């Protein structure tokens, strides 16, 4: 899908660049594949804000997307490509030969009428899914499982992909778009191709209201707050803060590493930080 820019007929149109979604399905989603979605405004079950800058926005229906692809050796036809408000990628409605319908993440170059299939060893075509054990090395994949049978967790957002670069014992080596080199079990499933809507990051919404429609609220700078609200707050006039930039809870906010999951460190062969200068 291409980008669409607008003439500056109003201040909100000036600089506006959106994805051209004219080729997507214009009707409602399949009702049996949707669920209601309750807004929580970034609050948890105790009512406290656990995710800042969230709230409001247009009402959404949740589309049930098949991230597992466990229906092996049954061919399916792509009925249509749809917009999904709950993710940055587009989704594809597929219909299996036995009549069952499902939503999957739409990869790039997947078109209406194409056939897709999941199995132990299938053709290397966008939309087909198989475990790494039957996949040729060098394949570009998305929707990668971290645990066999759990469903894809890696490379699901618009334009992302991982590359299958080698085998190591019972593990597959994959290179992620962040530069990280990581091991996953060879029984883990992955879908061929890169995720659709790669131009998503090149959009310019033109006005604050478009972000509000998406449920994104304004982000207030720490230096504009009072000392009670933020470590950067307070001071007469504009102040530099006098310390390294931190979050409201005092953790470094510009690249300080806070990852503490040591049990899975052994699966990371090369850190995503390794390519950075001086590290």
Curated annotation (Swiss-Prot):
UniProt GO molecular function: rRNA binding; structural constituent of ribosome; transferase activity
Pfam families: Ribosomal_L2 (PF00181), Ribosomal_L2_C (PF03947)
Gene Ontology process terms (BP): cytoplasmic translation
Start and end residues of each stretch annotated as Disordered: 223-279
Keywords: Ribonucleoprotein, Ribosomal protein, RNA-binding, rRNA-binding
GO CC annotation: large ribosomal subunit
Phosphoprotein listed as a keyword: no
Basic residues bias locations: 269-279
Signal peptide, first to last residue: none
Subunit structure: Part of the 50S ribosomal subunit. Forms a bridge to the 30S subunit in the 70S ribosome.
Family designation: Belongs to the universal ribosomal protein uL2 family.
Function as written in the Swiss-Prot or TrEMBL entry: One of the primary rRNA binding proteins. Required for association of the 30S and 50S subunits to form the 70S ribosome, for tRNA binding and peptide bond formation. It has been suggested to have peptidyltransferase activity; this is somewhat controversial. Makes several contacts with the 16S rRNA in the 70S ribosome.
NCBIfam families: rplB_bact (TIGR01171)
Name of the protein this chain belongs to: Large ribosomal subunit protein uL2
Annotated organism of origin: Paracoccus denitrificans (strain Pd 1222)
Gene of this entry: rplB
């Amino acid at each position: 899908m291409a980008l669409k820019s607008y003439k500056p007929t109003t201040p909100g149109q000036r600089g506006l660049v959106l994805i051209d979604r004219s080729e997507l399905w214009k009707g409602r989603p399949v009702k049996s594949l949707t669920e209601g979605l309750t807004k929580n405004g970034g609050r948890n079950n105790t009512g406290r804000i656990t995710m800042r800058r969230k709230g409001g926005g247009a009402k959404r229906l949740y589309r049930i997307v098949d991230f597992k692809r466990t229906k092996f050796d049954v061919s399916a036809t792509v009925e249509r490509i749809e917009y999904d408000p709950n993710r940055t990628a587009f989704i594809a409605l597929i219909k299996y030969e036995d009549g069952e319908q499902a939503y999957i993440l739409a990869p790039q170059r997947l078109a209406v009428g194409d056939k897709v299939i999941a199995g132990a060893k299938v053709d290397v075509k966008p939309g087909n899914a198989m475990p790494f054990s039957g996949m040729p090395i060098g394949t570009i994949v998305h929707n990668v499982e971290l645990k066999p049978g759990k469903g894809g967790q890696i490379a699901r957002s618009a334009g992302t992909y991982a590359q299958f670069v080698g085998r190591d014992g019972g593990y597959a080596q994959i290179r992620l778009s962040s530069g990280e080199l990581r091991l996953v079990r060879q029984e883990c499933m992955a879908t061929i191709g890169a995720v659709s809507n790669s131009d998503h990051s090149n959009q310019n919404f033109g006005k604050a209201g478009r972000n509000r429609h998406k449920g994104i609220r304004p982000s207030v700078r720490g230096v504009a707050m009072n000392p009670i609200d933020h470590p950067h707050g307070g001071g007469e006039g504009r102040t530099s803060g006098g310390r390294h930039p931190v979050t409201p809870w005092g953790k470094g906010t510009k690249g300080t590493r806070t990852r503490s999951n040591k049990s899975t460190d052994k699966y990371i062969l090369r850190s995503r930080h390794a390519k950075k200068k001086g590290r």
